Amino acid sequence: MSFDFRIPRRTLLKGIGAAGLGTALGAGGIRPLYAKGLAPITIVVNQSPWFESFRRTVEAYEAATGNKVELDVNPFAGSLEKQRNSVRSARGQYDILIMNSGWFAEMYAGGFVEPITDIDPGFKLDPEVYTLGDTIYYNAQKKTVTADGKLMSIPVSPLIPMLYYRGDLYKQAGLSAPKTFAELEANARKFHKPPGMYGIVQRGARGPHTVAYDFYPYLYGFGGGIFKDQSAGDYSVTLNSAQGREALDYYIRLARTAGHPKTAASDQAEVIQAMVTGHAAHIMMVIAAWSQMDDPNKSVVVDKIEWAPPPSAPGLPTAPGLGHWLAGISRNVPDDRKRAAVEFLRWFQTKDAQLETAKAGGIPVHAAVYKEPIADERKYRWMKPLAQALPNAVNIYQFPEASEVIAVLEIGLNRAVAGEISSVDALNGMADEIHKVMNRNAYKSGALQPLK
């Protein structure tokens, strides 16, 4: 089911303090004033945990400028379908597309998104906005998502997985947040007392982007990867490297020795449920779930959860996989709506607008917000760890056919976690299938020797 609704203009917004926001943003933003009296715009967006904060930020924009915004709200798959239909029509229905990390490359490579600086050559990206693996840029000539390309979008929600852990248990045991995988494993085993308490609960279920997404911090944190160098156009498959084997062996061992017995059937809802009901000492979960931990209507561990960047192997940085959202402007809409969309993005990227996003429960895309007093408040204790992790976030896919690779990973990883096949067979099999995908789509690719 989808929801079409026009957000009303307000002169005063309860709970968000938007009265006077236009003046404040004008004083501290990129431009002294934001354009008013623009054409109304329509944004197609998905119904996600962060949507409410986005909606309230849009309301603040309307109050500050008087400009009108309509939100077309849909389930995850429904949003993608509507975007695909709109960009392929003679005249687009949606001015701003809220694109997920799994499909933004499709929109860039297909020429469906207009570069922001082509619409307004004077547009400047705020230097403190996270570029999230440079995924806001696209070099059409090289077909790469790299900073030498044009500015295609502005980040909306910089989602990455973080380590959620029971701070109260850590305090009692005299432990500090784990920085290495060895420390995480030792701590998970220490707290593992099933069925009342599991050392860690992981996702292992097969889905549209489920077990694969949870595996990325381990794969890249051990120094592995799926491809050799996407930014250079080298799609040689490296999944079945020694590092890849170490990562998958670790993931499976963690599940079997300190995890839930039904890891292979666990999806996001089950993982979150284990944490909020007090049955998990650790989970690796997208940061958007933070508010559920302190919601007394859902959680028995209110004020007991802490956050840390995902661990990594010694000498390597944390490597959370991006699962973020970007806002791009559709190419097939009238020029006046394109210009109005640019003004919204110009406003949205500012520190002041992003501070309002944080106050509304969202995840800011502006680095300066994480240095504000709000980050020292107990309620927002996740902000500083997130700020540490974001600069190291990994863009997993830079090509339009990513869904074909994800489907291969979902099957192979799920079977390995379930014990149906060995990690070696899983990695070799997935690598072979991914190599076929890349060859079929005419990418420069290669393969490693199979693991023994």
Which sequence ranges carry the predicted segments?
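Long, aromatic- and glycine/proline-rich binding clefts that accommodate carbohydrate-like moieties
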Residues: 35-37, 130-131, 135, 305-310, ...
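Short, solvent-exposed loop/beta-turn-alpha elements that line the ligand-binding surface or hinge
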Residues: 117-136, 204-205, 222-246, 295-300, ...
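Glycine-centered hinge/linker elements that transmit conformational signals in sensory
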Residues: 188-194, 230-265, 306
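Extracytoplasmic/periplasmic solute-binding protein
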Residues: 29-30, 141-156, 161, 185-236, ...
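Hinge/lid segment of periplasmic solute-binding proteins
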Residues: 102-160, 211-214, 304-308, 377-378
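A bilobed periplasmic-binding-protein/Venus flytrap-type ligand-binding module shared by bacterial periplasmic
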Residues: 164-167, 322-336
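N-terminal secretory signal peptides
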Residues: 1-11, 18-20
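Extracytoplasmic "Venus flytrap"/periplasmic binding protein-like
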Residues: 36, 60-137, 168-179, 274, ...
